């Protein structure tokens, strides 16, 4: 497997081609329905050096990725955080490379000065892998969904 840490805009087209299939492959879906990424914001963040992706390739084929938006913690000046906005592993590679993807992500993020990586997930299997990678449940996420959610593609 070949791991790399690249700006989002360098792999955006590749991720876009596979996004619908990735959504279909995921067992647990969120309440929002099919993805409708804000590509402009992702690309702007990427060009500003604030959105990066750890990729996993089997030769040339993209078989996994983990995307992070990187920012300064507004309550603790000088603390750089990386929020995971998406993690995906091709079905045939699950259970084989996910833990290594998490560990490689940690290495790459530490190398650019990130102090804390944050994953917000609704999948206990990935949570179990994060625990194996020395993550701990640290923050409680509370959510209040107002009325029904209906989005229109823009």
Write out the residue ranges for each language-model feature.
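Conserved GNAT acetyl-CoA-binding A-motif
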Residues: 110-121
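A short, internal acetyl-CoA/4′-phosphopantetheine-binding micro-motif in the GNAT/acyltransferase core
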Residues: 83-95
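Conserved active-site alpha-helix within GNAT-family acetyltransferase domains
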Residues: 121-140, 150-152
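A short beta-loop-alpha structural element at the N-terminal edge
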Residues: 1-19
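Conserved beta-strand in the GNAT
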Residues: 55, 61-70
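Conserved GNAT-fold acetyl-CoA-binding loop/helix
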Residues: 23-42
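Conserved acetyl-CoA-binding loop-helix of GNAT-fold acetyltransferases
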Residues: 94-107
